[in-house]
């Protein structure tokens, strides 16, 4: 926890034009379920202020956040996926950035000496394993368990060939290893020139590689510049728990870190939630800002 109590440092509703939020560790609990308190708060906003944008900014692909997007009808607004490398508006892709195939293969080559490292790549829809890693794809399976759409039907060798040919257009790459061995991955990736990719981390068992020019901050700037130009950055409130949320925190006028988030997120955010994601952190903050009545009962959450 930050040495300074930032739990009450929140904007007033009349100064806000948009909410933008991370997903894992922020909207979802440790079991990767949408917390009811947060669903309730966001549903209230959708009902009372139907034109108030609620934007998802996540490392996940669009298909992996259906449990949030569909019940709240968030296709009405833009969304930033794969750490800002893919932007949607009204459910359609309006921008996508990609890693070069040769860069992906250089990382595969650099990590092949460690058979415990699993390399996976993301396109707009699926995740593909290029190398299996520890204990028969243990960490790849962990991605599937948190909602990532992993294509287990495609052999690693086939996926590699499709990356090389450009048939699989790679938006993000993840280098996976057990959390206590992840420093080995950092050492390997640290030898690459910065212009080849940027690294970030949202999950404890992998380092993510994305195009150097894309992140959640650039996604937010694109949205307010090109899709919702009436929204000013200083009137945006952002929520997040990890390192990959810092670029978004830097652009948004208001930033809220989750109480049990990464120390760097708590340090950099203007505010911190009173409770963690297990207790509906985002919902708790929105209740205060939007003055949500205690007796408000949303429609049943169904997905």
From Swiss-Prot:
Alphabetic keyword roster: Cytoplasm, Hydrolase, Nucleus, Phosphoprotein
One example GO MF annotation: magnesium ion binding
Assigned EC number: 3.-.-.-
Top-tier EC class: hydrolase
TM helices/strands, residue ranges: none
GO cellular component: cytosol; nucleus
Subcellular localization: Cytoplasm; Nucleus
UniProt cross-references to InterPro entries, sorted A to Z: HAD-like_sf, HAD-SF_hydro_IIB, HAD_sf
Pfam families per UniProt: Hydrolase_3
SUPFAM superfamilies associated with the record: HAD-like
PTM-bearing positions, type Phosphoserine: 63
Lineage: superkingdom: Eukaryota
NCBIfam families per UniProt: HAD-SF-IIB (TIGR01484)
Family: Belongs to the HAD-like hydrolase superfamily.
Protein name: Uncharacterized hydrolase C25B8.12c
